[in-house]
């Protein structure tokens, strides 16, 4: 790819995201989503590998279908109510269509099948964008229409996402697929609280973005695409590997790390809304995700593989430390003491 193309594509991503999150009109929001889709496709397929081209094709087809559904939903609502305002989504059919469209864009169960495959075919930093930045505009549309959405439908999709995200990640050895199923599982936590506390859903997404970005950047630095490469990278980056373990445990939601905060607040809010069974169910389902986080964390800290590995050991080289990785790693581990202040704001 031409080196001048990447900044243009990144600026287009920023433009598309800004248009969608700042618009009140459905057509403008749809335009922003389309700009985002067209800007990310060259970044997915830039390696010219057949798997990358396949991933870009799958991404384009699913996002095109979802965008068409968004447009159809808004047109149906405008036909019935005369309103193009995003917050005035009052027609029941439009609400159902929009929920399906955004679920496809986010990768919520049962529309999750494309997401792990696309992430597996993308470079690590593009996978980071797909897991974080690309989810922000559709999530913003859900937040703006949260008062019109069906709580029972979202709760069902959320519990299914938490279950399948944990269950399907159990047998994975590719780091990108593990993080894809981790993303699906976290989206379940966001979706279950979205109708009852939109601010808390947004906070959960922000913290998820910080933690996932830190993990992706750490994996990119040690060039770990699968568990075997994580297993043999301790000789090259011993400190980063130890930090990676803490970041993964934070992503799993273990106290006293940052990831515990959103889960704690969500369970508390669900209990206040008299949804104790749903809170118990999603808390139990998060144990599935905990298993594969623990397995990856164990691989990142082990200093002697239990059997001979096919990968050569990577020896230490004195490269300058990455400041963004260090900042994100610190935030993804140490934010739990701010919980009282965050709870007061939410």
Curated annotation (Swiss-Prot):
GO biological process entries: mitochondrial electron transport, NADH to ubiquinone
Catalytic activity: a ubiquinone + NADH + 5 H(+)(in) = a ubiquinol + NAD(+) + 4 H(+)(out)
Bilayer-crossing regions: 1-21, 25-45, 60-80, 95-115, 124-144, 149-169, 178-195, 200-219, 242-262, 274-294, 326-346
Signal peptide: none
Membrane topology per record: Multi-pass membrane protein
Keyword annotations: Electron transport, Membrane, Mitochondrion, Mitochondrion inner membrane, NAD, Respiratory chain, Translocase, Transmembrane, Transmembrane helix, Transport, Ubiquinone
GO molecular function, one term: NADH dehydrogenase (ubiquinone) activity
Location relative to the cell: Mitochondrion inner membrane
Enzyme Commission designation: 7.1.1.2
Top-level lineage group: Eukaryota
InterPro entries from the UniProt entry: Complex_I_Subunit_2 (IPR050175), NADH_DH_su2_C (IPR010933), NADH_UbQ_OxRdtase_chain2 (IPR003917), ND/Mrp_TM (IPR001750)
Entry's Gene Ontology cellular component terms: mitochondrial inner membrane
Described purpose of this protein according to its UniProt entry: Core subunit of the mitochondrial membrane respiratory chain NADH dehydrogenase (Complex I) that is believed to belong to the minimal assembly required for catalysis. Complex I functions in the transfer of electrons from NADH to the respiratory chain. The immediate electron acceptor for the enzyme is believed to be ubiquinone.
PANTHER family registered for this protein in UniProt: NADH-UBIQUINONE OXIDOREDUCTASE CHAIN 2
Stated family: Belongs to the complex I subunit 2 family.
Name the record gives this protein: NADH-ubiquinone oxidoreductase chain 2
Native source species: Mareca penelope (Eurasian wigeon)
């Amino acid at each position: 790819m031409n080196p001048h193309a990447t900044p243009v594509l990144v600026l287009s991503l920023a433009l598309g995201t800004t248009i969608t999150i700042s618009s009140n009109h459905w057509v403008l929001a749809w335009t922003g989503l389309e700009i985002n889709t067209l800007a990310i496709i060259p970044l997915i397929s830039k390696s010219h590998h057949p798997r990358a081209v396949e991933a870009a094709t799958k991404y384009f087809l699913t996002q095109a279908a979802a965008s068409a559904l968004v447009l159809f939903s808004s047109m149906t609502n405008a036909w019935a109510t005369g309103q193009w305002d995003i917050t005035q989504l009052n027609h029941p059919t439009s609400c159902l269509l929009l929920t399906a469209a955004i679920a496809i864009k986010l990768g919520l169960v049962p529309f999750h099948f494309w997401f792990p495959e696309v992430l597996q075919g993308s470079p690590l930093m593009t996978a980071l964008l797909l897991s974080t930045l690309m989810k922000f505009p559709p999530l913003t549309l859900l937040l703006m229409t949260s008062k019109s959405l069906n709580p029972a439908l979202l709760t069902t999709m959320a519990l299914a996402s938490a279950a399948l995200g944990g269950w399907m990640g159990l047998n994975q050895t590719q780091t990108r697929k593990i993080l894809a199923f981790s993303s699906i599982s976290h989206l379940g936590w966001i979706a279950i609280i979205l109708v009852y506390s939109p601010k808390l859903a947004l906070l959960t997404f922000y913290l998820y973005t910080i933690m996932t970005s830190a993990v992706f950047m750490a994996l990119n630095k040690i060039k770990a695409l699968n568990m075997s490469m994580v297993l043999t990278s301790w000789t090259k980056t011993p400190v980063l590997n130890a930090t990676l373990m803490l970041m993964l445990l934070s992503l799993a939601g273990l106290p006293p790390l940052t990831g515990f905060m959103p889960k704690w607040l969500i369970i508390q809010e669900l209990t206040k809304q008299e949804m104790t069974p749903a809170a118990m169910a999603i808390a139990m389902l998060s144990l599935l995700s905990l298993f594969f986080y623990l397995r990856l964390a164990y691989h990142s800290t082990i200093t002697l593989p239990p059997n001979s590995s096919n990968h050569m050991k990577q020896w230490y080289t004195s490269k300058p430390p990455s400041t963004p990785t260090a900042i994100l790693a610190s935030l993804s581990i140490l934010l739990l003491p701010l919980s009282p202040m965050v709870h007061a704001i939410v």
